[in-house]
A protein has these predicted regions:
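Conserved N-terminal phosphate-binding loop of PLP-dependent enzymes in the Aspartate aminotransferase
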Residues: 1-127
């Protein structure tokens, strides 16, 4: 959009990111912790799951494919299990994407405490 307010907000965001390069390291570190935690909990529960992640952007797929590489791969995942996961996380205060065809995103304001809480709630998920 060429809206002046949107352009100003975009420029302000870029200036903040340029001045605070450590934001990327922070987001990547949190993303890695979240991915590892989700995968570890899934192994403990014997749940077939993989997490596709780039930095702080990720999607949980209920499948034994690793990684999920295509739309056809994603369609073959357990969509009912994803629905249960979504409802569980949402009911417990985490507004994650309602479809495994979307990604969740971490941001600079997320903390290790947020990740720990997410993993605590995910651990209580009953597939």
């Amino acid at each position: 959009s060429g809206n002046p307010v949107v352009m100003a907000a975009g420029m302000a965001t870029l200036n903040i990111l340029k001045a605070n390069q450590d934001i990327y390291e922070h987001i990547n570190k949190l993303g890695e912790k979240l991915q590892n935690g989700i995968e570890e909990i899934a192994r403990e529960k014997n749940v077939k799951l993989t997490v596709n992640r780039v930095g702080g952007m990720m999607t949980v797929f209920f499948t034994d494919r690793n990684p999920v590489r295509s739309y056809d791969d994603a369609k073959s995942c357990d969509l009912e299990m994803f629905k249960k996961y979504f409802l569980h996380m949402n009911k417990n205060g985490f507004n994650i994407p309602q479809s495994q065809f979307e990604s969740m995103f971490l941001s600079a304001v997320h903390t290790e405490e947020h990740i720990d809480k997410f993993l605590e709630i995910f651990k209580r998920f009953q597939p």
